[in-house]
């Protein structure tokens, strides 16, 4: 921990917390800091110009990152009949109905995302207290409650990330790994920003994208000049 602390301190000394870095420079700094023994994630925090306390200004959605997330995702699907077969063909690891619900109640949750066909919500709805706190509860706003379960599975496997604004009005998301090429990280960040723009509440006034900062898992935040994103 001492070595990590010293490395973090050395990196922090290189970063001007008040400066807005061009995206290429910001990514170079963040990747330089990502020297842990594991492939650190590259995360983004976006401060939105919304009032998170107002229900009509809750920003939530999902986006498929063009370059993926660098993470292998296991998918569980609530579906029956033909839709169940389609989910399996698309790559879902676990597919079921009441049997899947019983597995979840027993604590057997070896998956990262849950998708549900609308006609199964009578079953899924009973699992809210288990799935909700874990961020696994299917929701139509992020595309995990859908009649097209096959596409939802493919999107999850392809690198879909979900986002939801927190109480402070900030969106947190992962846009890849430290091992990614800068071009891949830029592409993923642009896709996320575009999705956030599309999710802008009609009642949001003033500047919507207020601040954007990048960091690695063990690193410090580097603020990004939004003008450099538009120039990509």
Swiss-Prot record:
Family according to the record: Belongs to the universal ribosomal protein uL1 family.
Protein known as: Large ribosomal subunit protein uL1
Function: Binds directly to 23S rRNA. The L1 stalk is quite mobile in the ribosome, and is involved in E site tRNA release.
A GO biological process held by the record: regulation of translation
Source organism, top-level taxon: Bacteria
UniProt keyword annotations, A-Z: Repressor, Ribonucleoprotein, Ribosomal protein, RNA-binding, rRNA-binding, Translation regulation, tRNA-binding
Description of how the protein assembles with itself and partners: Part of the 50S ribosomal subunit.
InterPro entries with a match to the protein in the record: Ribosom_uL1_bac-type, Ribosomal_uL1, Ribosomal_uL1-like, Ribosomal_uL1/biogenesis, Ribosomal_uL1_3-a/b-sand, Ribosomal_uL1_CS
GO CC, alphabetical: cytosolic large ribosomal subunit
Keyword Protein biosynthesis: no
Molecular functions (GO terms): rRNA binding; structural constituent of ribosome; tRNA binding
């Amino acid at each position: 921990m001492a070595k990590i602390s010293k490395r973090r301190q050395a990196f922090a000394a290189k970063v001007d917390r008040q400066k807005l870095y061009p995206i290429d420079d910001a990514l170079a700094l963040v990747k330089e800091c990502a020297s842990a023994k594991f492939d650190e994630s590259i995360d983004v925090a976006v401060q939105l110009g919304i009032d998170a306390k107002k229900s009509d200004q809750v920003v939530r959605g999902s986006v498929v990152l063009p370059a993926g997330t660098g993470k292998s995702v296991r998918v569980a699907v609530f579906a029956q009949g033909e839709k169940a077969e389609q989910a399996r063909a698309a790559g879902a690891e676990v597919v079921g109905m009441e049997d899947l619900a019983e597995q979840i109640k027993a604590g057997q949750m070896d998956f990262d995302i849950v998708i549900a066909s609308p006609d199964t919500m009578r079953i899924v709805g009973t699992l809210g207290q288990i799935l909700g706190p874990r961020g696994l509860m299917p929701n139509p706003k992020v595309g995990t409650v859908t009649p097209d379960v096959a596409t939802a599975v493919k999107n999850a496997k392809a690198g879909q990330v979900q986002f939801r604004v927190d109480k402070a009005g900030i969106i947190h998301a992962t846009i890849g790994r430290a091992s990614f090429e800068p071009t891949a990280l830029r592409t993923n960040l642009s896709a996320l920003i575009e999705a956030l723009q599309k999710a802008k509440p009609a009642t949001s006034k003033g500047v919507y994208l207020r601040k954007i900062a990048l960091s690695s898992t063990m690193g410090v935040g580097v603020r990004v000049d939004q003008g450099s994103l538009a120039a990509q």
